């Protein structure tokens, strides 16, 4: 179907389908935060590992020691399974990815059969399903150092695509000639991305990044009686996370 074509052509639209063009642009903008390999050896190691590198190995408190050991999330697992990063890589990573994908398909079919008729509920469950299954695997490893999860890349790609679509529909309302103008504008953006040196500041003012900072909450979190402290801390942590998600959504 159309969704399959949009996903399949996310690296480059096959024609002038608006959604394909928007997702392709969003994918490229979202991938702009990937860290390039520093050496040829790093690239060769990363291409064979295919696992997400823990960002904690980049934390260097001793400025004299520039060398750090990379640690990997050894198995691609679901979010509800606790697993720490390790120095050794998994020798059966391809098989583990296949198992994870089969489990994802099974879970997807289940939520689709239960909530497929309600688009809002289905989108809600699909969002968390994808997070659950992709938070621990790299978005790319062939050409980039795999420190960005597939979940983070997918989420920002979707956010950029939706923002771009909504903004263009406001600028060019209606159908017919308006859609043709949208296509021409998207073609211009794609051509500019192919040669980023031609992009000027504020040339495409379509996005606003809003940063939220919840600080000074230590008193709220730790002002807890010792009796039942564990449950209270979990509850307050959930409340803060839920509050941030709600503010960001609305």
List each model region and its residues:
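Regulatory and interdomain segments flanking nucleotide-handling catalytic cores
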Residues: 1-4, 11-250
């Amino acid at each position: 179907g159309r969704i399959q074509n949009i996903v399949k052509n996310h690296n480059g639209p096959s024609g002038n389908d608006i959604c394909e063009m928007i997702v392709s642009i969003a994918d490229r903008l979202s991938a702009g935060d990937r860290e390039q390999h520093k050496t040829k050896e790093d690239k060769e190691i990363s291409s064979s590992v295919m696992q997400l590198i823990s960002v904690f190995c980049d934390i260097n408190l001793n400025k004299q020691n520039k060398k750090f050991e990379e640690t990997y999330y050894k198995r691609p697992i679901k979010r509800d399974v606790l697993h720490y990063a390790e120095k050794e890589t998994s020798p059966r990573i391809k098989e583990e990815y296949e198992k994870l994908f089969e489990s994802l398909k099974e879970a997807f079919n289940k939520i689709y059969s239960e909530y497929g008729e309600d688009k809002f509920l289905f989108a809600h469950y699909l969002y968390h399903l994808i997070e659950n299954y992709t938070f621990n695997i790299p978005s790319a490893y062939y050409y980039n150092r795999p420190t960005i999860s597939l979940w983070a890349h997918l989420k920002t790609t979707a956010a950029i695509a939706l923002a771009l679509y909504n903004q263009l529909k406001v600028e060019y309302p209606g159908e017919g000639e308006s859609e043709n103008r949208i296509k021409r504008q998207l073609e211009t953006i794609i051509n500019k991305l192919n040669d980023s040196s031609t992009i000027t500041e504020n040339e495409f003012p379509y996005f606003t990044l809003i940063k939220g900072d919840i600080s000074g909450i230590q008193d709220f979190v730790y002002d807890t009686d010792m009796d039942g402290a564990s449950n209270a801390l979990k509850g307050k942590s959930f409340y803060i996370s839920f509050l941030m998600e709600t503010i960001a959504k609305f």
